[in-house]
């Protein structure tokens, strides 16, 4: 994702160390390898998940035909036959979210451990920092695609309604083994979210903090705010931005920046928008607004609708108006 990138990180928004964070070529050191390899097994499937989601067309036509002609058995069978394999895909996406959650928790454990500061972790463990960024990048790409595809929830709702009717009528349901009732309930909650992958990561980060009570919460929140600063500085500094060899690096940095802001806002007691926040929210929003509008609308919506503290009374009117 670009060549060697020099970034300025400020753990406490004062002068911080300069170091290179290589989003493209970072290789794991011996101490990183165990976690890196575990996370890599998950990440290598990420692109295929996105391709499947991008090509997801839904069974809207077949479902409409079946609903309009309830007595026509052939149309009912055709709709069911179209929906079952699609639900198999939706199940695969959901199961991948669970794997991604486990990968994130492994990375958080490595990047927040004592005795190093978040800045030292990101500098020393660049391969893990890169994987953390890749998880966030995937998450926002997934959610952008999901938000613009209403067929997903329509297909799954039809599947559940039809399955329920078949049970009442004691009709054997081919494909029922694909998704049992408990799994279907969890999938329904997942797909009901506007940004389901981001919600999964937010919940995982909150759970990580609550389960690691011996670890200061600042270790986690400072890791997130430092990563946000890294991305913002790379994007707003022409000298750094000119080093990008690929325009895709810009969208990579934007998605990672937004992802860590949302995670920070869910984990930090007062959130990302408070005056005491270690994230320069005005600077981050300005960077987003400086991009072509159609390329960042999904990211701005993620900040508007999936953060926790944006609408708090303590959030400045200026920040609220910037996101209107």
Curated annotation (Swiss-Prot):
Function description: Negatively regulates RAC1 signaling and RAC1-driven cytoskeletal remodeling. Regulates chemotaxis, cell migration and epithelial polarization by controlling the polarity, plasticity, duration and extent of protrusions. Limits Rac1 mediated activation of the Scar/WAVE complex, focuses protrusion signals and regulates pseudopod complexity by inhibiting Scar/WAVE-induced actin polymerization. Protects against Salmonella bacterial infection. Attenuates processes such as macropinocytosis, phagocytosis and cell migration and restrict sopE-mediated bacterial entry.
Membrane-protein topology: Lipid-anchor
A Gene Ontology biological process term: regulation of establishment of cell polarity
Cross-link for Glycyl lysine isopeptide (Lys-Gly) (interchain with G-Cter in ubiquitin), residue positions: 74
PANTHER family, per database record: GH09096P
GO cellular component labels: cilium; extracellular exosome; extracellular region; membrane; mitochondrion; platelet alpha granule lumen
Cystine pairs: none
InterPro entries noted in UniProt: CYRI, CYRIA/CYRIB_Rac1-bd
Assembly notes: Interacts with RAC1 (GTP-bound form preferentially).
Annotated family: Belongs to the CYRI family.
Major place of residence: membrane
Keyword Mitochondrion on entry: yes
UniProt entry tagged with the keyword Ubl conjugation: yes
Gene: CYRIB
UniProt-recorded name of the protein: CYFIP-related Rac1 interactor B
GO molecular function terms noted in the UniProt entry: MHC class Ib protein binding, via antigen binding groove; small GTPase binding
Lipid attachment, kind N-myristoyl glycine: 2
Subcellular location: Membrane; Mitochondrion
Post-translational modification: Ubiquitinated at Lys-74 upon Salmonella bacterial infection.
Alphabetic keyword roster: Isopeptide bond, Lipoprotein, Membrane, Mitochondrion, Myristate, Ubl conjugation
Reported induction: Protein levels are negatively regulated by Salmonella.
Result of changing residue 150 to D: No effect on interaction with RAC1. Almost abolishes interaction with RAC1
């Amino acid at each position: 994702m670009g060549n060697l990138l020099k970034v300025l990180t400020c753990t406490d928004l004062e002068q911080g160390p300069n170091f290179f964070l290589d989003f493209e070529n970072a290789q794991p050191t011996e101490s990183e390898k165990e976690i890196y390899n575990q996370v890599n097994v998950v990440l290598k499937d990420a692109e295929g998940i996105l391709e499947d989601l991008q090509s997801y067309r839904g069974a809207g036509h077949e479902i409409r035909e079946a609903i309009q002609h309830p007595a026509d058995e052939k149309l009912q069978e055709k709709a069911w036959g179209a929906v079952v394999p699609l639900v198999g895909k939706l199940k695969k996406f959901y199961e991948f979210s669970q794997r991604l959650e486990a990968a994130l928790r492994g990375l958080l454990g490595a990047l927040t451990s004592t005795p190093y500061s978040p800045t030292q972790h990101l500098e020393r463990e660049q391969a893990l920092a890169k994987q953390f960024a890749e998880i966030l990048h995937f998450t926002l790409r997934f959610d952008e695609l999901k938000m613009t595809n209403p067929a997903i929830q329509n297909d799954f709702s039809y599947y559940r309604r039809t399955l329920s009717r078949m049970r009442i009528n004691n009709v054997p349901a081919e494909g029922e083994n694909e998704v049992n009732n408990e799994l279907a309930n969890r999938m329904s909650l997942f797909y009901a979210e506007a940004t389901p992958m981001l919600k999964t990561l937010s919940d995982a980060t909150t759970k990580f903090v609550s389960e690691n009570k011996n670890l200061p919460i600042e270790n986690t929140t400072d890791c997130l705010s430092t990563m946000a600063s890294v991305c913002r500085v790379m994007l707003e500094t022409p000298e750094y931005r000119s080093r990008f060899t690929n325009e895709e690096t810009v969208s990579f940095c934007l998605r990672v920046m937004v992802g860590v802001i949302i995670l920070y806002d869910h984990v930090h007691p007062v959130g990302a928008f408070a005056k005491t926040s270690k994230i320069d929210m005005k600077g981050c929003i300005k960077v987003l607004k400086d991009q072509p509008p159609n390329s960042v609308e999904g990211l701005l919506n993620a900040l508007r609708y999936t953060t926790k503290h944006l609408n708090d009374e303590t959030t400045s009117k200026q920040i609220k108006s910037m996101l209107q």
